Amino acid sequence: MARITVEDCLEKIPNRFQLVLAATYRARMLSQGHAAKIESKNKPGVTALREIAEGKIGLEMLKKVPS
C-alpha cells in the first residue's frame, strides 16, 4: 500500500493548519463510529488523511464540529 504524505493532502487543502484541523475532526468522527468514505484498515488518523488525499473529505470538515 502506498504511503500517504502531507504533500499529497496539501494538494487538496493548501493551508497546513486547516489540513490538520480537518484531519483531526475527521479522525475523531471515525473513532466515534462514523463510516469511512474509503476502504481502509488503518487507524482513524491515517484513514482521515487518505480520505483528504483522495478528495473524499475537504474544507467542509471545518464547518462540522465533532461532539
Curated annotation (Swiss-Prot):
GO biological process: DNA-templated transcription
Enzyme class, first EC level, given as a word: transferase
InterPro entries membership: DNA-dir_RNA_pol_omega, Pol_omega/Rpo6/RPB6, RPB6/omega-like_sf
Alphabetically ordered keywords of this record: DNA-directed RNA polymerase, Nucleotidyltransferase, Transcription, Transferase
Coiled-coil intervals: none
Family according to the record: Belongs to the RNA polymerase subunit omega family.
The protein's assembly and partners: The RNAP catalytic core consists of 2 alpha, 1 beta, 1 beta' and 1 omega subunit. When a sigma factor is associated with the core the holoenzyme is formed, which can initiate transcription.
Stored NCBIfam families: rpoZ
Protein name: DNA-directed RNA polymerase subunit omega
Origin species: Polaromonas sp. (strain JS666 / ATCC BAA-500)
